[in-house]
């Protein structure tokens, strides 16, 4: 056997039949073997070990194929892939870009790339990739900021309408205050929220200082004043004045979410509620410190007791709700432990239950507006109307419960009694095809809103509103918007509009489904009303999206990041607010 035959049988898994070598047509085979000097060898017939038959010279039209081994890469292809992963290659740049995205989006310290575990992980998935240093990552972050900020500036300069939200937050590690602003706009039929400015408050917090800074930020990001629909803030009077002086009195709006949060926050400060909450907190603390009590609780139910933070009413609510759910188990365990604190009385437990029932509508409302990436201004009035209806439907049985309900209604009237007179909120609600005018309770405020819309449309005719059937059921279900659906089903049209009135004819049409997209509704409308609808549906009512970025301690400024400059913080806030699509990943 020649060396070549030995090589073919050993390396290429074939048998050679030399008696029919000269009869084979190698072009008819599906599997070919290329040898170093093919001209020196005759065509040969191949028999695959896994194939029972011999492929003969007569099988020129046969489609018989044998199993193939994994194809080996060409040397030049392998070298190209290796070089792309190495420093300066396309694959290396892709990996670096994704690492930078991870560090900024997940609020990781830049030192993470120098940790032993991360280095081992990268070595296992990309052995030829060289991790950049911390200094290189910071430089790349600056370059990424320049590139992506240019793109966002182009978007902001091209959009018709946008909203701004502001927030002040504290860096507790370094005892510093920061002021930030976030832009909210619709681009390619998608809502976007981008942090465009962060500054350290090094000067006296005067209205003039904030006004100048806000104007500088909007100018830097190519935002025109006439394109700003609303500026939302939950800050003090000096911020309000700065916004009004910079953009106009009609464009300032107090944060709806913050106003809503203040109502239950004041109620839980009632002495009787605070006293019972402290007793429950003492019980929860005992279970955390006592191994015996904790083990007994664990054998009964696999849950951990949660305590509350005095500054957060939702935390108090969750603690009270958990205590109600576990009260029977907790009572039995406390009776078995000598050093256990005293269980609350039956009347106190009833007070806790009524407190939870009264606060639940507010929790549902907060969850509704917080679950979305942003809250349209058009939802504020419907949320208030639905929440008030839910609250009125509750009938407390105890004296303390009745007192709580009275206080909640008083605080509610104080905060939202004139919400329908807010021009931005009222126009946004009417122009939202899901709500229109069915949630208005103040006829004067409604007709004033129609007048504002009519003047914007250059029309003099005012149209009457649909009236509601007063027999609306007050059976409030678990769904927050169940009351809204009842209103939709019970409205009556008082007057009609002539069919050729294409613009105001919209008002007498039934509302669309609550889960429908109002922006898509107006996108296909090229009338003046459609343009007005797109304008006011771009408005937001709360600074919650900005607070998700600014107000959570430790999200951006970690102990390992506390030495970052204000410029780098501004870049981090901006990059964190962008999506993976914006990063072009």
Residue ranges: model-predicted function:
Residues 4, 118, 133, 167, ...:
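Mobile genetic element proteins and their domesticated derivatives, centered on retroelements
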Residues 8-18, 33-36, 142-151, 155, ...:
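Short, basic alpha-helical nucleic acid-contact segments in DNA-binding proteins
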Residues 1-27:
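C-terminal recognition-helix end and immediately following basic linker
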Residues 94, 113, 117, 136, ...:
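Generic recognition of stable, solvent-exposed alpha-helical segments in well-folded globular domains
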Residues 124-125, 177, 303-329, 347, ...:
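Amphipathic alpha-helical/coiled-coil segments positioned at domain termini
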Residues 197-202, 229, 301, 330-502, ...:
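Extended, C-terminal/distal alpha-helical "rod" segments
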